[in-house]
């Protein structure tokens, strides 16, 4: 049974500008240490911005699917890829529901779609 759905779209050049202006301060506020560490495999600023934009969209989409951001911060939500490259989302707070995640990017935009099932 579907509990909620959420979607978000992020303008990648905006994330790139934020990274240039605020750097680690921005990253440490939104992303987990592991997400930041995994981003280091990308050598170019453009690829890192794309990586973080998709994860930001996923976090926002999850909050929308949940119906509220109360009691949860962005760092409670982590986005990874399995060995086949499929994205998945974990939540550090007690959250038992099954979460489905789809990420995409094209040109200047990154999108995420989340379905929460109970």
UniProtKB/Swiss-Prot annotation:
It holds the Pfam family ACPS. GO terms for molecular function: holo-[acyl-carrier-protein] synthase activity; magnesium ion binding. Its cofactor is Mg(2+). This is Holo-[acyl-carrier-protein] synthase. Coiled coil: none annotated. GO terms for cellular component: cytoplasm. Its EC number is 2.7.8.7. NCBIfam families: acpS, pantethn_trn, PRK14659.1. Transfers the 4'-phosphopantetheine moiety from coenzyme A to a Ser of acyl-carrier-protein. It catalyses: apo-[ACP] + CoA = holo-[ACP] + adenosine 3',5'-bisphosphate + H(+). Keywords: Cytoplasm, Fatty acid biosynthesis, Fatty acid metabolism, Lipid biosynthesis, Lipid metabolism, Magnesium, Metal-binding, Transferase. The keyword Cytoplasm applies. Mg(2+) binds at residues 8, 60.
């Amino acid at each position: 049974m579907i509990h909620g759905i959420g979607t978000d779209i992020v303008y990648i050049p905006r994330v790139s500008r934020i990274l240039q202006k605020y750097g680690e301060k921005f990253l440490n506020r939104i992303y987990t240490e592991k997400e930041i560490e995994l981003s280091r495999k990308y050598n170019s600023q453009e690829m890192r911005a794309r990586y973080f934009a998709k994860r930001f969209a996923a976090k926002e989409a999850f909050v929308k699917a949940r119906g509220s951001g109360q009691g949860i911060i962005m760092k409670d939500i982590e986005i990874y890829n399995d060995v086949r490259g499929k994205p998945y989302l974990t939540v550090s707070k007690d959250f038992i529901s099954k979460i489905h995640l789809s990420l995409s990017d094209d040109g200047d935009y990154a999108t995420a779609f989340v379905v929460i099932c109970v």
